[in-house]
């Protein structure tokens, strides 16, 4: 077994935990989410010294969701849990972050290395002496593991994990045994900031791919740009915006790409999701002779049940690790460098005018005297109320699909979990996002269904504790609407117990730091949206938004029907 480095040989000795937390602060992390446990307590003592804020969540699952939301606004996040019981509680959230390319550094406090070596029968174990079993469980949902068991390699493992987390935009796992927390290592390397730059593409290969792309782009008569989630996750939005601006091409987003493009831009055409799209959007995208697809994730909920009608022969796919031109794939090529060179070398394109975007109310909704708040009326109306640079979070279900019809002001960030789709995610994510947004002076708005809210609403307590002021709309429609449309319309398992949502923040100790509203008609919601004090978000606000039980966005209905058919036929 390797011996520890003698402290006297270190030029700038520093404790392992301090090194780890200082690196996290260096890359922009300002708050750490998690739940304390006896194997991580001493490590948590280092947070104040490293100028990191401890959030302290109600449970590890919610903490994981919160870390996800924080990372989507801040760029990266950190989560601390304890061995076994704590880390396993967070795994659903970590899996979602892995699925959706969200960079979280998951730090797990572990028992003393000698206890592990001796196979002691400790609490939080399976009782079989295997102390690596939980690490193995995390391996498939982490892009790298950093097991800090020896001072000789600790700094390298920490630096590598943080860099991989950033570059690959996925969670990493760092185990920190109790005896390693206070061990001394060389701190001199902290004087050199981590290199978080992407590995450069091979210049010759990159130039060849750019030439191929430009050949098809200049030959196309009706090219369009389609932007999706991985353009956001892999940080190519500057390149995308420059491409959109310089090319003048009609530009659309997939549902997971909402917010990736300035929706007030003259080139912006709307959300393309196959059969769930606005008819004009669908016609323009599907009649195009060249789709420049940037960061696509073609999942079922992102495509209205795999209903894309665009062929690969007319598509160029840009991704973080490859570019695919029609049926030819070019591996080990990052889209960032390729997009930069395309913009530099593109020149003028021969394209026609872009159709003006529209998310106006449907004619039947404009003429309606109905007072019930329907999805067809709600979501375009929300777009008229939102502010520039808002952070808008939507829960899996009606909100996730309804937001497709909301036209965002400039600079709005959208957060949802379309691929992983864990109900309840949005509440924890709202806490994390609101914390990061507060640091940026931005407003946070959450739309969550009543069923999903019941899973994770403890994090409203954490919002109150951290003086966060999100505006929370709870869509009250008597249960799991998305699941009713898939199967079991009248089934009791899709029902929920009605809760008095407006009094929950009071039970959590909000007192004078909270305002609640109950809205049942369109006029009441119009009045609330016109209330300047409400819009200024002076404190945490919760709105019970009552909607018909059987109403849902048309895109959700189509997707649910597709899911039901697959469940029966596969």
From Swiss-Prot:
Q: Which of UniProt's keywords are assigned here?
A: Decarboxylase, Lyase, Magnesium, Metal-binding, Thiamine pyrophosphate
- UniProt lineage: Eukaryota, Fungi, Dikarya, Ascomycota, Pezizomycotina
- What's the catalysed reaction? a 2-oxocarboxylate + H(+) = an aldehyde + CO2; pyruvate + H(+) = acetaldehyde + CO2
Swiss-Prot/TrEMBL cofactor(s): Mg(2+); thiamine diphosphate
Q: Name one GO cellular component term.
A: nucleus
GO MF annotation list: magnesium ion binding; pyruvate decarboxylase activity; thiamine pyrophosphate binding
Family per record: Belongs to the TPP enzyme family.
Task: Spell out the PANTHER family in the cross-references.
Answer: PYRUVATE DECARBOXYLASE (PTHR43452), PYRUVATE DECARBOXYLASE ISOZYME 1-RELATED (PTHR43452:SF30)
Protein name as it appears in the record: Pyruvate decarboxylase
């Amino acid at each position: 077994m390797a011996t520890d480095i003698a402290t006297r040989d270190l030029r700038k000795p520093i404790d392992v935990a301090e090194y780890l937390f200082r690196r996290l602060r260096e890359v922009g992390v300002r708050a750490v989410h998690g739940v304390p446990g006896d194997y991580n307590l001493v490590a948590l003592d280092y947070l104040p010294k490293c100028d990191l804020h401890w959030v302290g969540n109600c449970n590890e699952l919610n903490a994981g969701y919160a870390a996800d939301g924080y990372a989507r606004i801040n760029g990266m996040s950190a989560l601390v849990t304890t061995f076994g019981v704590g880390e396993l509680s967070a795994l659903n959230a970590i899996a979602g972050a892995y699925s959706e390319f969200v960079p979280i550094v998951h730090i797990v406090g572990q028992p003393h290395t000698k206890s592990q070596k001796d196979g002691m029968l400790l609490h939080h174990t399976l009782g079989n002496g295997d102390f690596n079993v939980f690490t193995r469980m995390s391996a498939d949902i982490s892009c790298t593991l950093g097991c800090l068991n020896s001072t000789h390699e600790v700094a390298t493992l920490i630096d590598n994990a943080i860099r991989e987390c950033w570059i690959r935009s996925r969670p990493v796992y760092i185990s920190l045994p109790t005896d390693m927390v206070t061990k001394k290592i060389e701190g001199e390397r902290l004087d050199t900031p981590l290199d978080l730059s992407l590995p450069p593409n091979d210049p010759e290969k990159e130039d060849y791919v750019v030439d191929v792309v430009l050949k098809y782009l200049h030959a196309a008569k009706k090219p369009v740009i389609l932007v999706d989630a991985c353009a956001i996750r892999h940080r190519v939005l500057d390149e995308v915006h420059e491409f959109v601006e310089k090319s003048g091409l009609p530009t659309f987003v997939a549902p997971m790409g909402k917010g990736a493009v300035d929706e007030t831009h003259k080139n912006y055409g709307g959300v393309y999701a196959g059969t769930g799209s606005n008819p004009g959007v669908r016609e323009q995208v599907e009649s195009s002779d060249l789709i420049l697809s940037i960061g696509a994730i073609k999942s079922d909920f992102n495509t209205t049940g795999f209903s894309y009608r665009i062929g690969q022969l007319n598509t160029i796919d840009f991704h973080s690790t490859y570019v695919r031109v029609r049926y030819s794939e070019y591996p080990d090529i990052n889209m960032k460098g390729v997009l930069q060179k395309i913009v530099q070398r593109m020149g003028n394109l021969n394209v026609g005018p872009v159709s003006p975007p529209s998310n106006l109310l449907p004619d039947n909704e404009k003429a309606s005297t109905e007072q019930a708040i329907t999805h067809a009326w709600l979501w375009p109306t929300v777009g008229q109320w939102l502010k520039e640079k808002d952070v808008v979070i939507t829960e899996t279900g009606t909100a996730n699909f309804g937001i497709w019809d909301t036209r965002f002001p400039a600079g709005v960030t959208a957060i949802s979990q379309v691929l992983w789709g864990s109900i309840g995610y949005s509440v924890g994510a709202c806490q994390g996002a609101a914390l990061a947004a507060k640091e940026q002076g931005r407003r946070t708005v959450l739309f969550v269904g009543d069923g999903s809210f019941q899973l994770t609403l403890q994090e409203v307590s954490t919002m109150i504790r951290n003086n966060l002021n999100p505006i929370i709309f709870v869509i009250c429609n008597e249960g799991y609407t998305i699941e009713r449309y898939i199967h079991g319309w009248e089934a009791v398992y899709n029902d929920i117990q009605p809760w008095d949502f407006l009094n929950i923040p009071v039970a959590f100790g909000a007192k004078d730091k909270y305002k609640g509203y109950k809205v049942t008609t369109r006029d009441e919601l119009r009045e609330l949206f016109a209330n300047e004090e409400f819009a200024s978000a002076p404190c945490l606000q919760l709105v019970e938004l009552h909607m018909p039980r059987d109403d849902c966005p048309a895109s959700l209905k189509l997707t649910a029907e597709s899911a039901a058919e697959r469940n029966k036929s596969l």
